[in-house]
Each structure stands twice: as structure tokens, then as C-alpha cells.
Amino acid sequence: MSKPKKNLGKLKHYKRIFHTRDQIVHTALAWAAGIIAVFVVGYLAAPAVLDFGTHTWYTVVKGRDLDSPSSAAASEPAPAQSTPAPTPVPNVDQGSWAFASLSGFSSPEKMAETARQYQEKGVHYVVIPLKDSTGYLYYPSTLPDASKSVAATTIDAAAAAAALREAGLEPVASLCAFQDPIAPYTNRDMGIHYQNTEYFWLDAEQEAGGKPWLDPWSEAAVNYVAGVISEVKAMGFNTILLSGVQYPSYATSSCGYAGGGTATASHLAQLLKSWNDTLSADGGTLWVQYPLAAVASADPVAALGGTYADLGVQRLMIAMPAEVPENQEELLTAAKAAAKSAKTESVTVKTADSAVFQ
């Protein structure tokens, strides 16, 4: 007897029910994922859509081009204007002085090394001798009356000044004014003559090595000194230290100054004021060096044509003697008092190869 077949239809019916439920779940998940994707895409695309809409609105409706540089510049706020820092004004009454030798400026390498050494020592003013009492100029001057005065060995003065400035130092040109035995032989009108003669007045017997001097009353001599000052100023030396602004120490009545001039302090004062004013107008500073004894003397000094107070010096450097006198402190006190009485603005005291403010 055969076994009756099992009815599997009901089982098939249940399978279809379960299958339908799975499809519903999967469909719901798919719709949810699609909705989320739409939101994500919309979120990401929103800036571009807004930009496009804005651009369309302004270009089509308003007639403006947002992509043009002028429009972009107009839409950006102007940057705030910064106030420039004020340029510091150098104080001419601060810092120590050092007197350098020409050998320290014979090459660019030595210039840089010399500047570095003075910088490490805390020096501010570095004095370079560019014209001394021998009459020689230690730079290649182009002045016509300097044709015989340029020394055999010179330095590049402009490069020396630049090297010092790069190190934060102030270059100072040391110049001797009227004690000059060379220039008179180039232009005889510049020298002091004996009264009513064509012979040069000499500061000693010729056999003893007597030398001529430049005449403070000679227009040619005064212009020559002014030319040297102007020349070194143009090379970068804003500070000038001038010595030898005087008459010969042993001048006598036999000296015949140009134009019948006499050895007076008022004439030297006029020259100093003229040079100082010219320098100041061009941003320069003039210092004048005189020996201790000349400044300290209460009596008229022949070389000055009067007393120190008559000269009207604004910035003074007192040169101490090589041999220290017994009454040095007394003389220095008197010199400082004379400078104060004369209303000298700044005073320094030079000893050997350095100087300090007082």
C-alpha cells in the first residue's frame, strides 16, 4: 500500500509570506538610503548652487560682473593703514670715540674687521685722519688746489665710511684746516706771506725746517678748506672733526694776512659759523678740536686771536697734551668752565687715541 503524499502547499505559502516581508524591509532601507544620499548631495552642492544663483542674479538682473578684479576689490574691505615707525634721531652727545689708523682701512677685508673690533668695544664714533697737519690728504681728492696734497698712500674713504655705518658706527673725518705746508705751494694766494712781499711766512727758520701755513684771511684758502669738508661729507662722513682753525702759534707782526686782515678771534668765529651752517643744512655735524691750554687760558691766546669764548664753538673736543702737566686737573677744570661759560653745547676730552663726553 502506497503512502499518501504530504501536502507541501502550505509550506510553500509560508515561504512566500516570509519572502514578501524581506522585500518590504529591503525596499524601506533602500528608500531611506536614497533620501539620505539626496540630503548629502544637496548639502554638498548647496554652496555651488547658491554661488551660481547669486552670480546669475547679479550678472543678468543687476548687470554686474562678480568675476572682474574691480568688483572683487570693491567687495573686500580696505586694509588698515599702518602708521610707520618714526625714524630714530641720533644723539650726538652719546657714545665713546676712537681714533683709528689708516692701516685699518687699506682693504675691504680690513675695513670690515676694524669695524667689527670697534663695535665689540662699544665705540660709537670712529675718527679717520683724512687731512692732517702735514697737509696731506689721505683720499684721492679731485679739488684743483689739492693736486700736490694727495698722499702716496690713500684709502677708499667712501668705502671706509660705509663699512663703519654697516656696523652701526658713526664715521668721523678728521681734518686739519690752516696748518698746511703743502697747499700754499700749489696756489700761492692761499699762503701767509711776509708783510709786503711775495715770500711765504714760515713758522721757523728755513734751515730749521720752517713751514708755511694757509692764510685764514685768504679767500682761496678758506674755499679750499670748505671744499675738503664738502668732499668728505659727500663720501659719507656726516661728522667732521676740524683742528687747526687758528693762526700760527708763533705769528708776529711780520705776517701779512690777505686783505690786510689781522689775527682776530671774530674772523675765526665767522669761518666756523659758515662751515657749521653749511654742514648742518646738509645734515652734518661739526666738531672743533683745540688744545687744553688754549681753551683753559683766561687771557687772549695768540693762535686764537682772543679767548676761546670769542670763537662761538658749538661742539668742542679738548685735546689733552701728550706730556701730562702737573696742573692738568686744574687746567681741565678751567677748560670745562670756559666751555660752559661760552655756552658750548657739547664737550669731549681726547686722551691719546680715545675721547669721552663730559
What name fits each language-model region?
Residues 41, 45-54, 305-358:
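Substrate-binding cleft of secreted/luminal carbohydrate-active enzymes
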Residues 50-94:
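N-terminal, intrinsically disordered, polar/charged segments of Gram-positive cell-envelope systems
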Residues 110-136, 231-243, 308-317:
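Catalytic domains of carbohydrate-active enzymes, especially glycoside hydrolases
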